[in-house]
């Protein structure tokens, strides 16, 4: 007899004994023995057979039963109903067959392998018993005392089913589920019985299947309404939909559909109460497409389905363009072209059902609050055409000039001290977000592509409430957008536009594919000519900013991008600031390792020359392959710079480069050169330095240097060398194959001597 030992190691056959020693050992060979017993198939399955003599090695008993066998208990799950097979096995089995509608096991259409596995599952998956006392070892053990079943698994298994694997359930969408339900309601008896094996053909319901209530209940109306929204070209009405899709609103279902993605015509506040009763939002007395406006004003949004994964544009959905091709054009034609502001609702008169004209100049004047029109003017032809086109659309009492397709707020957040941000719409209608590129100062940057195949960078910024820190970040983001919207320079990343939704703001920028200088000098050794070419372009972009009284305040290699032509572009204007006439600032902004002494000292003011100090640190970073003060932590750097100490300049650098860096890192602000002065330095012009360099400001070079920077960006490739004898351009500053091996390692000597840390360890 095979016994189950009460050992704590027992788990599904772990303590079964073998048939040779009668179960006294724990070799774990009981499971193969039982499998061989099942595979014999020497008996026919007979319901009337007496199974009481089934006491061979295949039977299972618990040692805690003291010789008396427990009543077996087996459980079968059939169509979410539980049926137990007890001691009266014969009658219970007949009842079980009657329940499932079969007369013999072969009618169950279960394959032979499934028959064995399901039999084992019934026998060996009984609930856990209470702790029992092992008779052999005399100690308590919490074993799984598997209760036996008297089902004879040695009996003849039924024939294999035509399908060896169960058919996966057919997943239906909303429209198919509704059609499937209607098929059940109006089902006709069929000639065949049972489920077909083909998943493409549905089985008919049984005759006793309960009929569905086809009355227009709330669920039925809402489901029908959602179906009409997706299938019919007719616009839905404001309020709950009737079963027939008419404009009659059902009060009991008002506001029960909170997940609709449709928007409807709305009116300004303090209007009739029926709009609140027919609101699509659950009992909150607010329309679903309401936008917070001054003086309780409401504005209608586009009824086009909006796709959050693409863009916030009203014409970005291809399905909506096919269903309503003229909607966006009508909305744009009826919108106010110069301003999207809505007049004060308190000063707005009671509007008639029909309007005489929708011209913007007539609506710009605010009439008296108590004035009433003497007669109803004729309705605008565009409103009539729109009503005829959409059939059941409720006639709105809003002037069509106030019905705009898309509301663009004049600024992201109202911060009093920040410049106003006018949203610039990108030149595309549909765009898709691609791979993650990196993280900027206030958001993550992704790659994007528009419907015409143009690639760009997308900075994604969350607009959720993040406390005081989040408000400050949004405020600085306003500065970045305001500054970038007015900047057009080949050495500054181009701003393409913005879009926003309820939670995020998307800033579209020019995509610069080769990454930042910080990532490039880790891959390549920047030689002298490369550093000189990049520095000249950085100076060109800085001069453009300084001429417009803009301080970048975060110049470093990580914020300078390079394209495939070797043109550098200043990026990440989150720290930039446009100063007043005095040009002085006191705010503590920037990265510690690149900060000027006057920026670190809170008692001192600084101006555009703070960017010159950061430029010197950036040139030193490109030359050495590491950040300035790379071996120090931020607080140590701030202490050193605050006391007037600059980063150490290696002695093995070229004289022109060392002199250029030392002049940029001048502690005294009055002795620090400007961009115009640095553009005449021998390190930039390529002339040999014969003695101490004395920089003299040359105003006449302002226009020339800017023109040269434009010529530089338009050069076809950086691999061509300059043939003229004048100051070389960026193309002439490029590295030729012969000059690569001149000083490949000289500018990286200091990195190994001082064991500087990588820029990733420096918090910007």
UniProtKB/Swiss-Prot annotation:
Keywords: ATP-binding, Cell membrane, Kinase, Membrane, Nucleotide-binding, Plant defense, Serine/threonine-protein kinase, Transferase. It is found in: Cell membrane. ATP binds at residues 437-445, 459. It catalyses: L-seryl-[protein] + ATP = O-phospho-L-seryl-[protein] + ADP + H(+); L-threonyl-[protein] + ATP = O-phospho-L-threonyl-[protein] + ADP + H(+). Residues 1-81, 120-260, 325-348, 360-392, 706-764 are annotated as: Disordered. The keyword Cell membrane applies. The active site is at residue 554. Residues 14-30 have a biased composition (Gly residues). Its main location: membrane. The keyword Disulfide bond does not apply. Induction: Up-regulated in response to chitosan. Signal peptide: none annotated. PANTHER family: MAP KINASE KINASE KINASE SSK2-RELATED-RELATED (PTHR48016), MITOGEN-ACTIVATED PROTEIN KINASE KINASE KINASE 1-RELATED (PTHR48016:SF29). Belongs to the protein kinase superfamily. STE Ser/Thr protein kinase family. MAP kinase kinase kinase subfamily. This is Mitogen-activated protein kinase kinase kinase 1b. It comes from Physcomitrium patens. The lineage of its organism: Eukaryota, Viridiplantae, Streptophyta, Embryophyta, Bryophyta.
């Amino acid at each position: 007899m095979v016994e189950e030992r009460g050992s704590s190691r027992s788990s599904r056959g772990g303590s079964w004994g073998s048939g040779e020693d009668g179960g006294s050992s724990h070799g774990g060979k009981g499971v193969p023995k039982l499998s061989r017993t099942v595979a014999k198939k020497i008996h026919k399955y007979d319901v009337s057979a007496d199974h009481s003599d089934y006491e061979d090695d295949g039977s299972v008993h618990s040692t805690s039963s003291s010789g008396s066998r427990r009543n077996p208990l087996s459980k079968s799950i059939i169509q979410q109903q539980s049926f137990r097979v007890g001691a009266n096995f014969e009658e219970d089995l007949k009842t079980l067959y009657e329940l499932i509608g079969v007369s013999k096991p072969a009618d169950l259409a279960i394959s032979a392998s499934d028959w064995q596995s399901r039999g084992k599952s019934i026998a060996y998956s009984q609930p856990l018993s209470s702790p029992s006392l092992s008779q052999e070892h005399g100690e308590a053990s919490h074993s799984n005392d598997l209760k036996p079943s008297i089902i004879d698994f040695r009996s003849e298994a039924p024939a294999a089913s035509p399908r060896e694997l169960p058919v996966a359930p057919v997943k239906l969408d909303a429209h198919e589920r509704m059609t499937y339900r209607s098929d059940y309601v109006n089902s006709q008896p069929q000639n065949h019985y049972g489920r077909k094996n083909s998943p493409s053909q549905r089985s008919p319901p049984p005759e006793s299947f309960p009929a569905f209530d086809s009355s227009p209940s709330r669920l039925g109306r809402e489901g029908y309404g959602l179906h009409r929204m997706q299938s019919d070209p007719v616009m839905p009405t404001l309020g709950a939909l009737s079963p027939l899709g008419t404009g009659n609103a059902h009060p009991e279902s008002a506001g029960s559909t909170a997940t609709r993605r449709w928007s409807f015509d709305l009116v300004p506040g303090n209007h009739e109460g029926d709009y609140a009763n027919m609101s699509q939002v659950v009992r909150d007395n607010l329309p679903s497409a309401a936008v917070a406006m001054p003086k309780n004003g409401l504005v209608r949004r586009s009824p086009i389905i909006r796709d959050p994964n693409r863009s916030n544009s009203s014409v970005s959905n291809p399905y909506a363009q096919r269903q309503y091709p003229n909607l966006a054009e009508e909305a744009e034609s009826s919108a106010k072209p110069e301003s999207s502001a809505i007049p004060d609702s308190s000063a707005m008169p009671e509007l008639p059902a029909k309007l005489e004209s929708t011209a913007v100049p007539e609506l710009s004047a605010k009439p008296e609050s108590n004035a009433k029109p003497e007669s109803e003017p004729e309705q605008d032809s565009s409103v009539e055409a729109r009503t005829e086109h959409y059939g059941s659309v409720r006639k709105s009492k809003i002037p069509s000039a106030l019905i705009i397709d898309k509301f663009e707020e004049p600024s992201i957040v109202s911060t009093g001290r920040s410049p106003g941000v006018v949203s610039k719409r990108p030149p595309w209608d549909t765009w898709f977000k691609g791979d993650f590129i990196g993280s900027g100062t206030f958001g993550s940057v992704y790659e994007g592509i528009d419907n015409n195949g143009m690639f760009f960078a997308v900075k994604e910024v969350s607009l959720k409430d993040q406390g005081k820190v989040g408000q400050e970040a949004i405020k600085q983001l306003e500065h970045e957008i305001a500054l970038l919207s007015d900047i057009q320079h080949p050495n500054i990343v181009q701003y393409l536009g913005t879009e926003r939704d309820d939670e995020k703001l998307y800033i579209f920028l020019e995509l610069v594919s080769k990454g930042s200088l910080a990532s490039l000098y880790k891959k390549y050794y920047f030689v002298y000519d490369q550093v000189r070419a990049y520095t000249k372009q950085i100076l060109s972009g800085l001069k453009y900013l300084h001429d417009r009284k803009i301080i970048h305040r975060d110049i470093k290699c990580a914020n300078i991008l390079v394209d495939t032509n070797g043109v550098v572009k200043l990026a990440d204007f989150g720290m930039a600031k446009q100063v007043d006439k005095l040009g002085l600032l006191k705010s503590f902004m920037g990265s510690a390792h690149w900060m000027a002494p006057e920026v670190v000292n809170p008692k001192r003011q600084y101006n555009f020359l703070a960017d010159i100090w950061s430029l010197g640190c950036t040139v030193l970073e490109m030359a050495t392959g590491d950040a300035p003060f790379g071996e120090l932590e931020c607080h140590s750097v701030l202490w050193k710079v605050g006391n007037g100490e600059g980063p150490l300049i290696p002695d093995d650098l070229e004289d022109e480069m060392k002199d250029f860096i030392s002049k940029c890192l001048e502690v005294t602000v009055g002795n620090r050169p400007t961009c115009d002065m640095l553009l005449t330095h021998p390190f930039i012009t390529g002339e040999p330095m014969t003695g101490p360099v004395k920089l003299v400001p040359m105003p006449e070079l302002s226009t020339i240097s800017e023109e040269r920077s434009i010529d530089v960006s338009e050069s076809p490739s950086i691999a061509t060398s300059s043939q003229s004898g004048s100051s070389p351009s960026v193309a002439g500053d490029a590295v030729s194959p012969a000059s690569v091996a001149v000083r490949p390692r000289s500018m990286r000597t200091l990195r190994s001597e001082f064991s500087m840390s990588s820029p990733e360890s420096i918090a910007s």
